[in-house]
Amino acid sequence: PYSYPGVVPFGGEKVEWNAQKVSQYLAQPVDWAKARGVPLNRLVAGEFGCMRRLAGCKSYLDHVLTALDANNLHWAFYSFREDSWDGMDYELGSEKVNWKYWEAIEANKPDTLKRQPTAEFEPIRKRLQP
């Protein structure tokens, strides 16, 4: 697996992804909209996220959201309390879930894991506050 920040194959070459690169990359649709007279409040960044157990997930989320917030863009992260995979359920932190979680999923029942504020969820949580 990859870690963030770090080098990742992208567009046929190896690219260093960090806060600056994320900001630069996410500026492209903003520049496109401005060049065409599309109001920025019409742009939505949807379904971004990272596997919560990978190194740098919290930083990645924070860097993406910081770049989006710089232009007051709408956003929707993936995935809030996903019911079939724990990988992007940031309220679970960075540890593995116990077997009871998977037993519930396999039985098509709600899992009983308690969600709570975690370091991984903080970049999102703080932006959801009034």
Language model: regions and residue ranges:
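Aromatic-rich peripheral "rim/lid" segments of glycoside hydrolase catalytic domains that contact
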Residues: 55-130
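Extracellular glycoside hydrolase catalytic/binding regions
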Residues: 1-71
